Amino acid sequence: MKRIALLGCGSMGTQIALAIDSENFPATLTHVYDESKDASFSLTQKLKNKPEIVENSHLLSSQPIDIVVEAASQNAVKDVALSVIQNKKDLMIMSVGALLDESIYDILSDACNDFKKTIYLPSGAIAGLDGLKSVKDELESISITTTKHPRSLKGAKFFETSDINLDEITSSTVVYKGTAKEAVTLFPANINVAALLSLTGIGSEKTSVTIVADPNTDKNTHHIEASGKFGTMTFTIENVPDSNNPKTSRLAILSAIETLKKYCSDDIQIGT
């Protein structure tokens, strides 16, 4: 049975942990870490099988585990990812925006080759990545329009220097237009989907991102358009926001859980 360590005990990390702790999950959660010891302790109290709480993030990768699941932040990825691979552990990353820093991506890619380990990036809050992977060499353009309630965008770095006041928005309003590379730094907790599209497709500087704040929606909606020699693809995903963290879609959490199940299973695998 696979042994899993969890980095990040917030809303997403908690729900991943609860899934692993269920009777039908083919793995064991053995270690957890969060910057907040209270968050780590609170999580363990919800579990039947109590994982060990480690004292710092770098201790996770030195434990007798198979994979570290990151559900914390882009900074956590930058701080810990390399040591996980160097300690010959696999890694699943939810804060995918960190990988749009080309130096980090290249270092981690080289480390995976050197240490024969794998980094897993769940498809998160969008669908259609299998199709995009299949036509990657023929892609010419790709764009994503993300629509969320203003409260789901609060706290984003973008609004520190913007004149836009989210509390004053009364109708659907475009708050950002630009590249995925810029978007993941300005909206680090909101737009991991753009990072995934960039890594799957034609890169972060060629992936167009539009972010819309709509006080009349109760969904996190992603509309994706891609075109090239293969033809065109258009798909729209309307996600229910996580009840504890509206910045995150329920689908992103379910995607992480399913990716872990696939990692821990040796049965028939579906998809590209």
UniProtKB/Swiss-Prot annotation:
Entry coiled-coil feature ranges: none
A Pfam family this chain is assigned to: Asp_DH_C
Metabolic or biological pathway: Cofactor biosynthesis; NAD(+) biosynthesis; iminoaspartate from L-aspartate (dehydrogenase route): step 1/1
Keywords in alphabetical order: NAD, NADP, Oxidoreductase, Pyridine nucleotide biosynthesis
EC number: 1.4.1.21
Reaction equations catalysed: L-aspartate + NADP(+) + H2O = oxaloacetate + NH4(+) + NADPH + H(+); L-aspartate + NAD(+) + H2O = oxaloacetate + NH4(+) + NADH + H(+)
Annotated GO biological process: NAD biosynthetic process
Presence of keyword Oxidoreductase: yes
Record-listed NAD(+) binding positions: A125, N192
Entry annotation: catalytic residues: H222
Record-level Gene Ontology MF annotations: aspartate dehydrogenase activity; NAD binding; NADP binding; oxidoreductase activity, acting on the CH-NH2 group of donors, NAD or NADP as acceptor
Enzyme class (EC, first level): oxidoreductase
Annotated function: Specifically catalyzes the NAD or NADP-dependent dehydrogenation of L-aspartate to iminoaspartate.
Family that this chain belongs to: Belongs to the L-aspartate dehydrogenase family.
Additional remark text: The iminoaspartate product is unstable in aqueous solution and can decompose to oxaloacetate and ammonia.
Official protein name in the record: L-aspartate dehydrogenase
Organism: Nitrosopumilus maritimus (strain SCM1)
